[in-house]
Amino acid sequence: MTSAALAPSSAAPAGAGAAPRSRAAVRRWLFAMAALVIAMVAVGGATRLTGSGLSITEWKPVTGAIPPLSAEAWTEEFAKYRATPQYDILNRGMSLAEFQVIYAWEWGHRFLGRLIGFAFFLPLGWFWWTGRLDRRLGLGLLGLGVLGGLQGAVGWIMVASGLQPGMTAVAPIKLAAHLTLASAIFAGLVWLAAGLDRAPDEPLPRRLRLTALALPLLMLVQIALGGLVAGSKAGLTYNTWPLMDGAFIPPLSGLFAVTPWIENFVDNVALVQLNHRLAAYGLLAVAALHWLDLFRTRPGSRAAKRAGAILGLVTAQAALGITTLLLAVPLWAGLAHQVTAMLVLGMAAVHARIATLSRA
């Protein structure tokens, strides 16, 4: 989807005299959708951290909305799971009651995805039918809806990778793709909502607008790298900071031990974790420099205050990441780290969108 498609038009909606109310309603709906996506990411993170993601072995977009309702149905679902490599290698001897717990996490994650689909497309159709969306905004929203449908397919491709012979978890690259696409959809929702009927701030020079735009892009890259850390379980190794096995950067022989060399970026836990660390340092530096630039050139402005909030969130996220690493990824810390990443991305997207409206 192009940035032009995502950019809200300044043209008034078709409904005469309804622009303020309809735009406000659309904005509230978009922020509500963004909140649902955060909830989806949180439940997905809990599903992964509890080892529940492979408990449902089939993809049934319609009939799968109904969980097992009888003892016979539960026995059938459990039999399907017992045929998976994860059960055979990791969970042999699991009871039906234990299976029902992990099944509930994965079913809840999928059900929330279906709920988000209804919560998106039904209001979208209503707003469009009643003339409350101009063409550009409507097409941008439709594009996000298509990405949401694609996200469901990517989720199943990810799960299917973990059901292959010898696999006990999903492929890291596919988990990273699933998380990054969800994050991009979230950023798109926030971007659109932040630009609706908003009066421009004090004009910003091109330098500040570009650094504002860089922040959500860097955060998306960092989320993708975090997805690789989660998928490869790299957070369970090198549980020290700031050093990794006694060095700020481990020896290259260890970082590129896998052949071919390109696979180290996905399969070598040392390089995967190092990349996530270095990207975090880079993001923190850009956020700090951007705030300092605004503090010096636009002191007291709304842009400077937003940049300060972003810097605070990035700092908190870095502290959470370090805590999560030192504690070897407890459930609460892993979830807090994942949710805070979405908050950083959301704030950065709002700031970047407003900055693009504030041309000098």
UniProtKB/Swiss-Prot annotation:
Cofactor(s) needed for function: heme b
Biological or metabolic pathway of the protein: Porphyrin-containing compound metabolism; heme A biosynthesis; heme A from heme O: step 1/1
E.C. number(s) listed in UniProt: 1.17.99.9
Molecular function GO labels: metal ion binding; oxidoreductase activity, acting on NAD(P)H, heme protein as acceptor
Catalytic reaction equation(s): Fe(II)-heme o + 2 A + H2O = Fe(II)-heme a + 2 AH2
Coiled-coil segments on the chain, per record: none
UniProt keyword annotations, A-Z: Cell membrane, Heme biosynthesis, Iron, Membrane, Metal-binding, Oxidoreductase, Transmembrane, Transmembrane helix
Membrane topology according to the record: Multi-pass membrane protein
Pfam family membership, one: COX15-CtaA
Compartments it resides in: Cell membrane
Residues the record lists as binding heme: H276, H337
One GO BP: heme A biosynthetic process
Bilayer-spanning residue ranges: 29-49, 111-131, 139-159, 175-195, 210-230, 242-262, 269-289, 309-329, 330-350
Gene Ontology cellular component annotations, sorted alphabetically: plasma membrane
Subunit structure comment from the entry: Interacts with CtaB.
Record function comment: Catalyzes the conversion of heme O to heme A by two successive hydroxylations of the methyl group at C8. The first hydroxylation forms heme I, the second hydroxylation results in an unstable dihydroxymethyl group, which spontaneously dehydrates, resulting in the formyl group of heme A.
Family: Belongs to the COX15/CtaA family. Type 2 subfamily.
UniProt xrefs under PANTHER family: CYTOCHROME C OXIDASE ASSEMBLY PROTEIN COX15 (PTHR23289), CYTOCHROME C OXIDASE ASSEMBLY PROTEIN COX15 HOMOLOG (PTHR23289:SF2)
Record's protein name: Heme A synthase
Source organism per UniProt: Methylobacterium nodulans (strain LMG 21967 / CNCM I-2342 / ORS 2060)
Gene: ctaA
